[in-house]
Design a protein with these regions (language model features):
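Nucleotide-activated sugar donor-binding and catalytic core shared by glycosyltransferases
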Residues: 1-162
Length: 162
């Protein structure tokens, strides 16, 4: 089953676009529940997923935190592609790839964000979901999962610089 956690500003559009999709996808709409309930439901959906197709950004860290293999896809308008393409100095934009210093999470960014290649990327991840597990674990370890609270780590880092 397809589950789509939608952001509040686009939830109505997501519901409209997915209304006639095969399999009757479930759209999680944050406007329909309390913030804590939405967050818990979204995390449960992430945890239960065989694979996630996600936009680039912090969602890749949310997926890594629950060990869910992913494919990243994100497009932007032409002028943004041109500007950002000239500014980027890295060969990946996915946080899991950057933090783990790997390239195991497939990315379809800008002009490469097309249905055919994305679908093939999702199928490849479904065939070999374990390929991302080590990178996700390393990412979470480097970000301090299971260690001190983030606020305490940040305070210690600031104090160490003083």
């Amino acid at each position: 089953r397809v589950v789509v956690p939608a952001a509040a500003p686009v939830a109505a559009l997501v519901k409209q676009v997915t209304r006639n999709w095969a399999g009757n996808p479930l759209v999680l709409d944050p406007r329909d529940m309390a913030s804590e309930e939405f967050t818990a439901t979204k995390r449960a959906a992430f945890r239960a997923a065989d694979v996630a197709l996600a936009a680039s950004g912090t969602v890749s860290l949310e997926l890594a935190a629950v060990n869910t293999p992913m494919v990243i896809a994100y497009d932007m308008n032409w002028i943004s592609r041109q500007i950002i393409g000239r500014m980027l100095r890295v060969d990946t934009v996915t946080l899991v790839n950057l933090v783990s210093e790997t390239r195991v999470v497939p990315e379809f960014i800008g002009a490469n964000c097309r249905p055919g290649p994305i679908a093939e990327g999702v199928l490849q991840v479904l065939r070999a979901p374990g390929a991302q597990k080590d990178a996700m674990a390393l990412t979470m370890q480097r970000l301090g999962q299971g260690g001190e609270a983030p606020g305490l780590r940040a305070a210690r880092a600031v104090l160490a610089r003083m």
